[in-house]
Amino acid sequence: MHPDSQLETAVKNGFDPKSLYSTELTKVNEPARTILEQYSKIPAEKVLQHVKDLKDRAFEVFPYACIGQASFLELSIASSPCYPEMLDRVKKGDRLLDLGCAFGQELRQLIYDGAPSQNLYGTDLRPEFLELGLDLFLDRSFIKSHFIDADVLDDKSALVTQLTGELNIVYISLFLHVFDFETQIKVAKRVLDLLAPKAGSLIVCRVVACRDQAIGNATNARLPYYYHDLASWNRLWERVQEETGLKLKVDNWEQDDALAKKHPLEGIYMLGSSIRRE
């Protein structure tokens, strides 16, 4: 279901999008603050107001919780155990896509850490978010990364026509849960199509998971999201392997995450996963 349709359905069922907006943004945590000060050259005393203004503009585009609660500032890619490999490979020429990148904040982490920006790709359904990312990081004049507004399931999108078989790494963070289980399988297969058809092609995921799926999916009547537990996550990739004939090595871990600790649902945690083509 398209996010606009999801929101419309949720509102009809009594959901108030404004409930996702928090006014309690009083500081910008690391590493986002350092990136905004040193990469974007924003004076320290102006960082907080700069972020608040951007947050308000973005929430008007679409009321995602990650925007309303400013969790897009909680950069997470560097906390993945796969990050050293991802960074090293991009430095050596591999191409990495952040799928559902929002403002491209994780890509700026890679660039700040020395990744050549021209080897990085970001895609989001909403072109406004890609533009807002350029405003957030003030790098419109010099960043060489490739930003593509696209629906990952649209066969005719620029993402598909330009990048099928061309990528080496795809990073997916806080994205898959907005789809139901069967659609997640379609997305996973599409991502595999985008990757180079060779051993070592890599998907790295950060997934909202729940120890008790009954609790995690109890909000479906209002927000039709699908929260995995470990068993369902493994089942997803087993299905993908069965349907594609590909052999994948799937490694999972529980990832310490500030966003999960603040989540209102009981038993929510952040599931990290790497899916490597063999």
From Swiss-Prot:
Binding, S-adenosyl-L-methionine: D124, L125, D151, V152, L153
Pathway participation: Secondary metabolite biosynthesis; terpenoid biosynthesis
Keywords assigned by UniProt, alphabetized: Methyltransferase, S-adenosyl-L-methionine, Transferase
Database matches in InterPro entries: Meroterpenoid_MTases, SAM-dependent_MTases_sf
Disruption phenotype: Drastically reduces the production of andrastin A.
Superkingdom to which the source organism belongs: Eukaryota
Family label: Belongs to the class I-like SAM-binding methyltransferase superfamily.
PANTHER family: METHYLTRANSFERASE AUSD
Role of this protein: Methyltransferase; part of the gene cluster that mediates the biosynthesis of andrastins, meroterpenoid compounds that exhibit inhibitory activity against ras farnesyltransferase, suggesting that they could be promising leads for antitumor agents. The first step of the pathway is the synthesis of 3,5-dimethylorsellinic acid (DMOA) by the polyketide synthase adrD via condensation of one acetyl-CoA starter unit with 3 malonyl-CoA units and 2 methylations. DMAO is then converted to farnesyl-DMAO by the prenyltransferase adrG.
Record-given protein name: Methyltransferase adrK
